[in-house]
UniProtKB/Swiss-Prot annotation:
Protein name (Swiss-Prot/TrEMBL): tRNA 5-methylaminomethyl-2-thiouridine biosynthesis bifunctional protein MnmC
Keywords: Cytoplasm, FAD, Flavoprotein, Methyltransferase, Multifunctional enzyme, Oxidoreductase, S-adenosyl-L-methionine, Transferase, tRNA processing
Family statement: In the N-terminal section; belongs to the methyltransferase superfamily. tRNA (mnm(5)s(2)U34)-methyltransferase family. In the C-terminal section; belongs to the DAO family.
A Gene Ontology BP annotation from the UniProt entry: methylation
Reactions the enzyme catalyzes: 5-aminomethyl-2-thiouridine(34) in tRNA + S-adenosyl-L-methionine = 5-methylaminomethyl-2-thiouridine(34) in tRNA + S-adenosyl-L-homocysteine + H(+)
Gene coding for it: mnmC
Matching Pfam families: DAO, Methyltransf_30
Function of the molecule: Catalyzes the last two steps in the biosynthesis of 5-methylaminomethyl-2-thiouridine (mnm(5)s(2)U) at the wobble position (U34) in tRNA. Catalyzes the FAD-dependent demodification of cmnm(5)s(2)U34 to nm(5)s(2)U34, followed by the transfer of a methyl group from S-adenosyl-L-methionine to nm(5)s(2)U34, to form mnm(5)s(2)U34.
Annotated Gene3D superfamilies: D-Amino Acid Oxidase, subunit A, domain 2, FAD/NAD(P)-binding domain, Vaccinia Virus protein VP39
EC number(s) on file: 2.1.1.61, 1.5.-.-
A cellular component annotation (GO) from this entry: cytoplasm
């Protein structure tokens, strides 16, 4: 069975207050002066102080083999801040740090370890505040308003490097080869790791390590680095430095899921909901020139316009990609929303998913068997549900303590307002009719004879995405739904958490003293007219799931208050994020893919045309990470997702899976 919780570091603090690993019998940093050793070995060994002012790109990427207490990262971050203060006009503006850790520290141990270096406190406190829960995979932390990005990969580095997407190849400017000493932790110091370091290193990229072990030097040379010895720090006689002086050939392991970015930095986004709003922010942070075209007269009039939406992950014991994506998307979303410098109605009150019948009880039992971290999800017995939710249901379930609700409409509006302050241009009542290539750009034809030309285009317009010739064959479908707005009552007012059953019920929003009950589900429909039948069904589903609950019968729908919207969904419940695939070319190029995988060309896509769509009913959870993934891909930066999960988000995935099995593909 797949486990979704990572084992934390097993450590103790010695007489000097230095953390020591019980498993590896080694210190996390020098008892003498760990901070100075980091500056000498890793910053000095990679010549970063001299390289930063002369670096010709806006982003510098550092990768590290063992995060530990984060000393190397914090020291580098401090040095990077000092560089930016001294050279405000330098080309280099942002720092990206990628680190791998098999046994992450608990937050409490991290805080204790950081007390060693009071001079690093301003940076350490920011790291502590965002320290992720022990889930496998990549945790992206956006620090210093996005000027510093930390990708923490939890798991075995030798396993993780083989799971990295090809888009990370030749992206790393400097390697910090750190970790417990080779004699203490031989499983990490392998030729497999050295080869991965070479694959990820940019031509002329560097590396530094505290060890001078001969097998390490020879292994790195065999991988492609030019190595040399340097005087070690303090009492250590020698250390190693290296340079990638060659350009290694890089075969693409899965060309049918290959992702391409763009060298251009000017984009039009078609949308107006949460996906386009968050993508605008992510691209502006990367210095893109962004224009948004919205078909409506105001933002968030589509699927993002609800008063309250629940935030919690979608989990399934039988779907590895779904679990990996949504668990990491959920934790990223919470960190992201907590940092946003905009106001929006929300309450991280928790979400409880209830087993209201035999099928839902079985599903929850399977989820609980996945060894999830307690910070993510915990079992709750029927007699405890009333205590944590405030209402009696006679059902057991699963609770997401960090979940809750937020107002999507307010979030979307205020994020777009923030983006406008950062340079976003918005045009309302621009209904895109079609788009076509013209002189290496995209010509956009809008209703009422309006036209515009842009270098890059992103389609983030929900269920309307399939209205264009380039996207008409995508396997997505519309789902119309009605959310009921009901006034609170003395009993309903006791509800403290979001309840999920065969529907959902939110606690009252203090801003309007109403609850939301959702939502009806009409697959294939785009009808947004109010429905008395849907209103009644929303109420009845609540009563049917909790027949003994008097509070459920108090739900009053007589005001006929509701909101109808249309979602865009996929069969596998995952979003579509990436290049817009060329359907006809895919069928031609991959006609014999099942028999000729070794001859496969890169996935046929439309140049400089991307999509962020099909968020279904979990857009509040998935949109922040999807926006970050797409912005990173478009900007040719490291993507915070492993290759197999990233493939499960690829817009061509449903076609390619069939073609890999030699099956016929139908449009839509």
């Amino acid at each position: 069975m797949k486990h979704y919780s990572i084992q934390p570091a097993n450590l103790e603090f010695n007489a000097e207050g230095t953390p020591v690993s019980r498993d590896f019998d080694d210190v996390y940093f020098s008892n003498d002066n760990g901070l100075e050793e980091t500056r000498y070995v890793f910053l000095g060994g990679n010549q970063l102080e001299a390289r930063f002012p002369e670096y010709p790109h806006p982003l510098f990427v550092v990768a590290e083999s063992g995060f530990g207490t984060g000393l190397n990262f914090l020291t580098l971050w401090q040095a990077f801040d000092q560089f930016r203060e001294a050279h405000p006009q330098a080309q280099l503006q942002r720092l990206h740090f990628i680190s791998f850790e098999k046994f992450p520290l608990t937050r409490s141990d991290l805080v204790l370890a950081h007390q060693h270096w009071p001079e690093l406190a301003p940076w350490a406190e920011q790291l502590q505040a965002q320290w992720p829960m022990p889930l496998p995979g990549c945790h992206r932390l956006l620090l210093d308003e996005g000027r510093v990005t930390l990708d923490l990969w939890f798991g075995d580095i030798n396993e993780l490097t083989s799971q990295l997407d090809d888009s990370l190849n030749q992206k790393v400017d400097a390697w910090f080869l750190d970790g417990f000493a080779p004699a203490k932790n031989p499983d990490m110091w392998t030729q497999n790791l050295f080869n991965a370091m070479a694959r990820l290193a940019r031509p002329s990229g560097t590396l530094a390590t505290f060890t001078s072990a001969g097998f390490v030097r020879r292994g790195l040379q065999d991988a492609g680095f030019t190595m040399q010895k340097r005087k070690g720090f303090g009492r250590k006689r020698e250390m190693l430095c290296g340079v990638m002086e060659q350009t290694l050939p890089l075969p693409c392991s899965t060309p049918w899921f290959n992702r391409t970015g763009s060298s251009k930095r000017e984009v039009a986004i078609i949308g107006g909901g949460i996906a386009s709003a968050l993508l605008s922010l992510a691209l502006l942070r990367r210095s893109w020139q962004v224009t948004l075209y919205c078909a409506d007269e105001a933002p968030a009039l589509g699927a993002s316009g609800n008063r309250q939406g629940a935030l919690y992950p979608l989990l399934s014991k039988h779907d590895e990609a779904l679990n990996r994506f949504f668990s990491n998307a959920f934790t990223f979303a919470r960190r992201f929303y907590d940092q946003l410098p905009v106001k929006f109605d929300h309450d991280w009150c928790g979400v409880t998913q209830l087993g209201w019948d035999e099928k839902s009880q079985h599903k929850i039992a399977q989820m609980l068997s996945m060894d999830l971290p307690e910070e993510l999800a915990v079992a709750v017995e029927a007699n405890a549900v009333e205590q944590i939710t405030g209402v009696a249901t006679n059902c057991s379930g699963i609770t997401y303590p960090q979940g809750g609700w937020l107002c999507p409409a307010e979030l979307t509006r205020n994020v777009l307002e923030l983006a406008q302050q950062q340079g976003l241009q918005i045009y309302y009542q621009y209904q895109l009719q079609d788009l076509s290539r013209k002189d290496d750009c995209w010509l956009l034809n809008f209703a009422e004879d309006q036209q515009a030309t842009h270098s890059v285009v992103v389609l983030a317009n929900g269920h309307q995405i399939s209205r264009f010739s380039q996207t008409s064959s995508l396997p997505v479908y519309s789902v119309a739904g009605q959310v009921s707005h009901i006034p609170t009552t003395p009993e309903l007012a006791k509800l403290k958490q979001v309840l999920c059953y065969d529907g959902y019920l939110t606690p009252q929003n203090p801003a309007n003293q109403h609850h939301c009950i959702g939502a009806s589900y009409h697959r294939g429909s785009e009808d947004t007219a109010y429905s008395d039948e849907d209103q009644q069904q929303n109420r009845q589903r609540l009563i049917d799931c909790f027949p003994q609950a008097q509070w459920a019968k108090e739900v009053d729908i007589s005001e006929k208050e509701a909101r109808c919207g249309v979602r865009c969904a996929t069969r596998d419940h995952l979003p579509m994020v990436g290049n817009v695939p060329d359907y006809e070319a895919t069928l031609v190029e991959y006609a014999s893919l099942a028999e000729q995988k070794d001859k496969a060309v890169s996935a046929p896509v439309y140049d400089d045309l991307f999509m962020l769509d099909a968020l279904g009913s979990r857009g509040l959870c998935s949109a922040p990470l999807c926006a970050e993934i797409l912005a990173a891909q478009m900007s040719e930066e490291p993507i915070p997702m492993d290759a197999s999960t990233l493939a499960a988000l690829n817009p061509n995935r449903l076609w390619v899976r069939k073609l890999l099995k030699g099956k016929a593909v139908k449009a839509g």
